[in-house]
Amino acid sequence: MKYSKLLLLLVSVVQALDVPRKPHAPTGEGSKRLTFNETVVKQAITPTSRSVQWLSGAEDGSYVYAAEDGSLTIENIVTNESRTLIPADKIPTGKEAFNYWIHPDLSSVLWASNHTKQYRHSFFADYYVQDVESLKSVPLMPDQEGDIQYAQWSPVGNTIAFVRENDLYVWDNGTVTRITDDGGPDMFHGVPDWIYEEEILGDRYALWFSPDGEYLAYLSFNETGVPTYTVQYYMDNQEIAPAYPWELKIRYPKVSQTNPTVTLSLLNIASKEVKQAPIDAFESTDLIIGEVAWLTDTHTTVAAKAFNRVQDQQKVVAVDTASNKATVISDRDGTDGWLDNLLSMKYIGPIKPSDKDAYYIDISDHSGWAHLYLFPVSGGEPIPLTKGDWEVTSILSIDQERQLVYYLSTQHHSTERHLYSVSYSTFAVTPLVDDTVAAYWSASFSANSGYYILTYGGPDVPYQELYTTNSTKPLRTITDNAKVLEQIKDYALPNITYFELPLPSGETLNVMQRLPPGFSPDKKYPILFTPYGGPGAQEVTKRWQALNFKAYVASDSELEYVTWTVDNRGTGFKGRKFRSAVTRQLGLLEAEDQIYAAQQAANIPWIDADHIGIWGWSFGGYLTSKVLEKDSGAFTLGVITAPVSDWRFYDSMYTERYMKTLSTNEEGYETSAVRKTDGFKNVEGGFLIQHGTGDDNVHFQNSAALVDLLMGDGVSPEKLHSQWFTDSDHGISYHGGGVFLYKQLARKLYQEKNRQTQVLMHQWTKKDLEE
């Protein structure tokens, strides 16, 4: 079956792993070197993990998984008892089943099949409702043709909200009611358009049932006036190219262009009455709704987190569903940078029975560091639950009975994640793992927070264990990745270390270094910088580092590159000041930091300062371009993959968050664009530009314009190399494009390592061309 198989958890109880993990990445015990085929063509050594779909309608600790025979099975981790929910031969559409969602009372299953991917998160599918007792199933819509965009169970009752052709519908015990009738190419109800899916909500839905199931809040997006961008597909998934390319037309607002307008509506499930909520925190053309959350146990209050267009002003607007009256209960000025949409609002209610106020929990960085706060639903000053020069990265679960919030933070170091709980009644903080040891943890909690699967994510080989929140001893091991531990014994792996590089300005940059196997300080090694560097991003972490292309270039005896990944200013989890420094000037400080790091690396005796490369993808490709443009001489090779070259070409909601509008920052946009060519002319080993022609995110336009600039200004063909990947999107994988890309990159690195300082050049590079 195509849906994820969530395998049966191990029954035997173990108190500890057979092989304890170390606070550093493994280096292997053997002599084998990683090969291209093992790291790129197929990642042969890859740890696995298991996830479960915790059930809210059963005893806490129950979850559902697909057994080896394909049947849906419910198991309780306390009793180790299991029962079949749906036999494999009774699953509707059989092997075409793509995913499933269990009704909260376990009476029915909602199946998706015949799915077609749309954008990063969204897909179209057919949906079926199956009764668990009779095993009979019915289509959500009798005439469905793989065209339903989203469907979701209500938490109470036998109701499903779903979206088809951008219109909202409600399914009640088999009866379908159409709620909206103006959905179409320019109007979306309950699902996001491209830009909200990609940049704001990060998901494929825009509807939320109230906790009691009596109301549904949903967003609508009107794209009237939003400019269209056309992506051409030359092969269109055919063996022989059609005479005319297939064209995908996307409403794609670029900088200073018209954005979609957004509204919040409230649907009474029983009466089917719809009211538009008055979210007038900003003018309609200046409004972004980033989050919707019910601040109630029933349906009395719903809140919208509203931002202005450039996302440096924020207001939380609470709406009373009975009166449809809106009140601003929280506001924030973030004009020193930007305000991230963290999607972290969680209702907890009154803290004490005598309290008149109810509260919700949210993450805010208004102190300069991202921390947990209690916010009164009626408005007022927030109460801090955590504080310090470190950041809370996510809320994992809230146990309202014990009044505990479970969260991850960088308290030990910005490159690490440790698991804690904090009481929102006593403010006591408790680590659930040893937070004095370098590690990268995460966890998945049961519906009532009584149990959790703890995942050790690195730097050593990952594993998972099952815990009860009443004990610090594991109930059992879920995944030990013993196979990976055994595999790596035969290899000599790159040695990964971490350090902080001080800047002259006083800040420090996190650096992850890979040294080739068998490293000797008596040799000289070329070095490859591999930045991403985008706002709020983080590449330097103590996660398990995949044995991928970066491991290969350090391992291949004909390459043996040292690699440095440097998180420059603007990246995340080091405080607001550090990340906000790049506001209105993307590409400036980031490039300065990468150049400074390269200059420091060049002073290391075992680094070959004549062969220092840099390669980045997406924002990393843009950053590589800006580094070369600086003409610092610090780098001798650049590989630029799927870059932005001019921020006017990218979408408005991402770009204006950091750069603000073109009319208020024209100089900043001009400086941030790649405009100067001398650095490209002077980079000794040349550079390579790669891009997919079907990229619907960072459009091929960026690389086309960059190459035109460089050619037009006389950059020689010895220096300028470019590669287009037909119909590939931002990930570059279509028709073998991914393997080709990495082969090409390996070839460039080999050529750079063996490049002599005196390069033989054709005569046209030795003198100016005459008209």
Curated annotation (Swiss-Prot):
Its localization reads: Secreted
* Name by which UniProt lists this protein: Dipeptidyl peptidase 4
Which species is the source of this protein? Answer: Aspergillus oryzae (strain ATCC 42149 / RIB 40) (Yellow koji mold)
Instruction: Provide this UniProt record's keywords sorted from A to Z.
Output: Aminopeptidase, Glycoprotein, Hydrolase, Protease, Secreted, Serine protease, Signal
User: What EC identifiers does the entry list?
Assistant: 3.4.14.5
List the GO molecular function terms. Answer: aminopeptidase activity; dipeptidyl-peptidase activity; serine-type peptidase activity
CC annotations in GO? extracellular region; plasma membrane
How activity varies with pH is as follows: Optimum pH is 7.0. is active between pH 4.0 and 9.0.
One GO-annotated biological process of the protein: proteolysis
Task: Name the domain of life.
Answer: Eukaryota
| Chemical reaction(s) catalysed | Release of an N-terminal dipeptide, Xaa-Yaa-|-Zaa-, from a polypeptide, preferentially when Yaa is Pro, provided Zaa is neither Pro nor hydroxyproline
Similarity field = Belongs to the peptidase S9B family.
Span of the signal peptide:
1-16
Q: Which residues form the active site?
A: S618 (charge relay system), D695 (charge relay system), H730 (charge relay system)
Q: What does this protein do?
A: Extracellular dipeptidyl-peptidase which removes N-terminal dipeptides sequentially from polypeptides having unsubstituted N-termini provided that the penultimate residue is proline.
**In terms of one coarse class, where is the protein primarily found?**
secreted
Pfam families, per the entry: DPPIV_N, Peptidase_S9
Quote the SUPFAM superfamilies the UniProt record gives.
alpha/beta-Hydrolases, DPP6 N-terminal domain-like
Which residues get glycosylated?
N37, N80, N114, N173, N222, N470, N495
